[in-house]
């Protein structure tokens, strides 16, 4: 059960970092 929690936290952290970079620097593809 603890392994599942660690995996969830890891994915959550990656998602937060991804969205932080995504919203801070809007990709040019979205502006097409």
From Swiss-Prot:
Primary location recorded for the protein, binned into one broad class: plastid
Membrane topology: Single-pass membrane protein
Location within or outside the cell: Plastid, Chloroplast thylakoid membrane
One Pfam family from the record: PsbT
Subunit and interaction comment: PSII is composed of 1 copy each of membrane proteins PsbA, PsbB, PsbC, PsbD, PsbE, PsbF, PsbH, PsbI, PsbJ, PsbK, PsbL, PsbM, PsbT, PsbY, PsbZ, Psb30/Ycf12, at least 3 peripheral proteins of the oxygen-evolving complex and a large number of cofactors. It forms dimeric complexes.
PANTHER family associated with the record: PHOTOSYSTEM II REACTION CENTER PROTEIN T, PTHR36411
Protein name: Photosystem II reaction center protein T
Originating species: Cyanidium caldarium
Name of the coding gene: psbT
